[in-house]
Curated annotation (Swiss-Prot):
The keyword Acyltransferase does not apply. The chain crosses the membrane at residues 571-591, 604-624, 640-660, 683-703, 730-750, 763-783, 792-812. Its main location: membrane. Belongs to the G-protein coupled receptor 3 family. TAS1R subfamily. This is Taste receptor type 1 member 3. The gene is TAS1R3. Pfam families: 7tm_3, ANF_receptor, NCD3G.
Length: 852
């Protein structure tokens, strides 16, 4: 074992720029074990010319070094060594590893993949009818890092049901269990990352964006997923295009140039770039040379941390770069592990001992695995020591170890002896596996994905290299720290990327053209409202609700009816008090002077009955105000018509008596006068009221009024009123009263008055005129007034009718009783009666005898 002094000296030599002797890292990429794990890492990068000139099935030479690939390979080594040193996970067993370079190219990755599938102890893949007992060289594979490679290798491994755990392949298509039944990954799928990106656009109100993707499976599927996510959130993609890979021909490069030109000329200020590192590098290289105006770039995880993209000259002028990176546990011991490992690789004694051990291993048929790894210094890899995918590699190894622990049924004392585990047996324990890595508990879901948080990263330029700053987090929902974001705008204000302005409160969008984000703002009419800011149509309020113009909510309609406290009702109640007071006063006078000639000439008891009926008409007015009820609606018309019929029938008897006395021969007058007084008069009143009862009964049975709530009559209230179902039947209910009034008018209008006598006919004539004027005016007024005021109109008509009859017929008599009692004599009031006519008849007979 090497001493600390030797390690320190080796590490000091390793840190020197351009130092020294080659390392022996390339000899440390495989180690024997009871169970072998394969590893696929991008240790180098191939020259483009090697692909273009390839005419034979030989592998391209990977000459360029990839620091991240080497660090990920070292993370796998560290995880395997930790597991082998633990006594609780695989006690008594050792894991081995066989790590290969993919050069980030499918052509290169296929050779080690075939090697992994070769039969254990050989280099051959035999053809069998059944591979259940087939034991390949490795039990499981860690990697590769990209979706493009995983799409190729995944189908190889899936045929053999060999577990494959990728630490970077995020394409959603890899979640398809029917195509990739043995694929797992320790990174979330692209759908999660793209959902976070769509939430970010929605958070900042960017709904007019450009979406670009690399022209490969990764970019094409990413754009397809993003298009669906954006459409569901009301985000419009103004420009969409694919970025050709660097080795594409000039005609395909021209397409992305056209897209960038359109983006530069439009109002789009935000671009989603879901592309591989090389495609993003090519795009920005052209954008810088063509002086594309600064934008907000929403980056995919593939290029967000790429040194190749970050190091482009002029990249700082491209605008604001935001993107999401998977959050994992911090491997605090990893930087020291790398430093120690590189120090050992620089020590000749260690490398010599390692070379002797390598001689005991099988010859490496793929040649030297990473020759460029032997020519690096610590400075070459120091920038990626805390790369976020390092933990993903670490967790992938622990997932396989935990599944093997479960398969072997290991416990604290060891793992029971049994036949070697086959890959398909291990796969059964990988599904829905829960495992621990770096202090975190992780779990594969049914699609082989893990649920991990994302950090929202912002590029903050410090000199020529940007640093990644945390400005938010996504774990199913997005949380941003806006104050930490530094925008590329001169005033550090958030850029606006919208096709149309945000509609104001109470306005909805009327879409123009093909994009839902381009629209005019239209006001919501009364009775409708805007429910959500992105609505394209106004939502109608419910039947019991209302809203003003440009409203964002509906209000409950309150019930509207003729309330007791309304000014019109209060005025009518004052009028009612006046009318009822006059009726009671007149009734009191008539009762007090019931035996006087004036009262007897007015009908005596019938006159008092008529006044009582007028009082009942006044009281019936109280049925109209207030919230209507079914009983109230049914009682309004009968209880107001019947008392009026009783009053008019008594006046009809007065008119008939005056007509008989004045216009008919004395012989007829004597015969009819008895029918107009006494019991016969009451019979006439009863018959008139029975006719009215019959009409009212028919009205209530055939067309009963009902309480209805009208939701449309008033803009903000619900009108509750008694609805008349038939205006014809309503008019017929007035027929008895109208007929009695008309007969009264005819019986008194042309009657000759007698000199020196009280003109009873005149009072009746004016009373009937008041009746007709009131009810004739009532009809057009009722038809044109608001429905809510119709009860007030009928109240007013009844009270005016009562006051008209009082003023024309009863009050003059009351005046005579009070102010001129001397006229209250039989000669003044009863002279025109039948007795007087008989006296005049006798006088005429005597004069005839004298003449003879």
């Amino acid at each position: 074992m090497l001493g600390p002094a030797v390690l320190g000296l080796s590490l000091w030599a390793l840190l020197q720029p351009g130092a020294g002797a080659p390392l022996c890292l390339s000899q440390q990429l495989r180690m024997k074990g009871d169970y072998m794990l394969g590893g696929l890492f991008p240790l180098g990068e191939a020259e483009e010319a090697g692909f273009r000139s390839r005419t034979r099935p030989s592998s391209p030479v990977c000459t360029r070094f990839s620091s991240n690939g080497l660090l990920w390979a070292l993370a796998m080594k560290m995880a395997v060594e930790e597991i082998n040193n633990k006594s609780d996970l695989l006690p008594g067993l050792r894991l081995g590893y066989d790590l290969f370079d993919t050069c980030s190219e499918p052509v290169v990755a296929m050779k080690p993949s075939l090697m992994f599938l070769a039969k254990a102890g050989s280099r051959d893949i035999a053809a069998y009818c059944n591979y259940t007992q087939y034991q390949p060289r490795v039990l499981a594979v860690i990697g590769p890092h990209s979706s493009e490679l995983a799409m190729v290798t995944g189908k190889f491994f899936s045929f053999f049901l060999m577990p494959q755990v990728s630490y970077g392949a995020s394409m959603e298509l890899l979640s398809a269990r029917e195509t990739f039944p043995s694929f797992f990954r320790t990174v979330p799928s692209d759908r999660v990352q793209l959902t976070a990106a769509a939430e970010l656009l929605q958070e900042f109100g960017w709904n007019w964006v450009a979406a670009l993707g690399s022209d490969d499976e990764y970019g094409r599927q990413g754009l397809s997923i993003f298009s669906a996510l954006a459409a569901a959130r009301g985000i419009c993609i103004a420009h969409e295009g694919l970025v050709p890979l660097p080795r594409a021909d000039d005609s395909r490069l021209g397409k992305v140039q056209d897209v960038l030109h359109q983006v530069n000329q439009s109002s789009v200020q935000v671009v989603l770039l879901f592309a591989s590192v090389h495609a993003a590098h090519a795009l920005f290289n052209y954008s810088i040379s063509s002086r594309l105006s600064p934008k907000v770039w929403v980056a995919s995880e593939a290029w967000l941390t790429s040194d190749l993209v970050m190091g482009l000259p002029g990249m700082a002028q491209m605008g604001t770069v935001l993107g999401f990176l998977q959050r994992g546990a911090q491997l605090h011991e990893f930087p020291q592990y790398v430093k120690t490992h590189l120090a050992l690789a620089a020590d000749p004694a260690f490398c010599s001992a390692l070379g002797e051990r390598e001689q005991g291993l099988e010859e490496d048929v793929v040649g030297q695995r990473c020759p460029q790894c032997d020519c690096i210094t610590l400075q070459n890899v120091s920038a990626g020591l805390n790369h976020h995918q390092t933990f993903s590699v670490y967790a992938a190894v622990y997932s396989v170890a935990q599944a093997l622990h479960n398969t072997l049924q290991c416990n604290a004392s060891g793992c029971p002896a049994q036949d070697p585990v086959k890959p398909w047996q291990l796969l059964e324990n990988m599904y829905n596996l829960t495992f621990h890595a770096g202090g975190l508990m992780l779990r594969f879901d049914s699609s082989g994905n893990v649920d991990m948080e994302y950090d929202l990263k912002l590029w903050v330029w410090q000199g020529s290299v940007p640093r990644l700053h945390d400005v938010g987090r996504f774990n199913g929902s997005l949380r941003t720290e806006r104050l930490k974001i530094r925008w590329h705008t001169s005033d550090n204000q958030k850029p606006v990327s919208r096709c149309s302005r945000q509609c104001q409160e109470g306005q909805v969008r009327r879409v123009k053209g093909f994009h839902s984000c381009c629209y005019d703002c239209v006001d919501c009419e009364a009775g409708s409202y805007r429910q959500n800011p992105d609505d394209v149509t106004c939502t109608s309020c419910g039947q019991d609700e209302w809203s003003p113009e440009r409203s964002t909510r509906c209000f409950h309609r309150r019930s509207r009816f003729l309330a007791w406290g309304e000014p019109a009702v209060l005025l009518l109640l004052l009028l009612l008090s006046l009318a009822l007071g006059l009726v009671l006063a007149a009734l009191g006078l008539f009762v007090h002077h019931r035996d006087s000639p004036l009262v007897q000439a007015s009908g005596g008891p019938l006159a008092c009955f008529g006044l009582v009926c007028l009082g009942l008409v006044c009281l019936s007015v109280l049925l109209f105000p207030g919230q209507p009820s079914p009983a109230q609606c049914l009682a309004q018309q009968p209880l107001s018509h019947l008392p009026l019929t009783g009053c008019l029938s008594t006046l009809f008897l007065q008119a008939a008596e005056i007509f008989v006395e004045s216009e008919l021969p004395l012989s007829w007058a004597d015969r009819l006068s008895g029918c107009l007084r006494g019991p016969w008069a009451w019979l006439v009143v009863l018959l008139a009221m029975l006719v009215e009862v019959a009409l009212c009964t028919w009205y209530l049975v055939a067309f009963p009024p009902e309480v209805v709530t009208d939701w449309h009559m008033l803009p903000t209230e619900a009108l509750v009123h008694c609805r008349t179902r038939s205006w014809v039947s309503f008019g017929l209910a007035h027929a008895t009263n109208a007929t009695l009034a008309f007969l009264c008018f005819l019986g008194t209008f042309l009657v000759r008055s007698q000199p020196g006598r009280y003109n009873r006919a005149r009072g009746l004539t004016f009373a009937m005129l008041a009746y007709f004027i009131t009810w004739v005016s009532f009809v057009p007024l009722l038809a044109n007034v608001q429905v809510v005021l119709r009860p007030a109109v009928q109240m007013g008509a009844l009270l005016l009718c009562v006051l008209g009859i009082l003023a024309a017929f009863h009050l003059p008599r009351c005046y005579l009783l009070i102010r001129q009692p001397g006229l209250n004599t039989p000669e003044f009031f009863l002279g025109g009666g039948p007795g007087d006519a008989q006296g005049r008849n006798d006088g005429d007979t005597g004069n005839q005898g004298k003449h003879e």
